[in-house]
């Protein structure tokens, strides 16, 4: 997680210094972040029912 935050900060610095013409890198990072977020949500969605089967209340 720390590496991703560092990568995002560096990408923001790059976008500010070079201007919007080279800010395509930011779009790629945004798409990666959204994909990771969706994968994490899917993983949690799969893990919750399994957890409920293993640890009934």
Swiss-Prot record:
- The answer to keyword Secreted applying to this record is yes
| Primary location group | secreted
| Compartments where found | Secreted
Biological process (GO) annotations held by this record are: defense response to Gram-positive bacterium; innate immune response; male-specific antibacterial humoral response
Q: What does this protein do?
A: Male-specific peptide with moderate activity against Gram-positive bacteria.
* Record-stated family: Belongs to the andropin family.
Q: What is this protein called?
A: Andropin
Tell me what organism the protein belongs to: Drosophila mauritiana (Fruit fly)
């Amino acid at each position: 997680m720390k590496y991703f935050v560092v990568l995002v900060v560096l990408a923001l610095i790059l976008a500010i210094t070079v201007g919007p013409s080279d800010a395509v890198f930011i779009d790629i990072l945004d798409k990666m972040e959204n994909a990771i977020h969706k994968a994490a949500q899917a993983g949690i969605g799969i893990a919750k029912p399994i957890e409920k089967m293993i640890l009934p209340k």
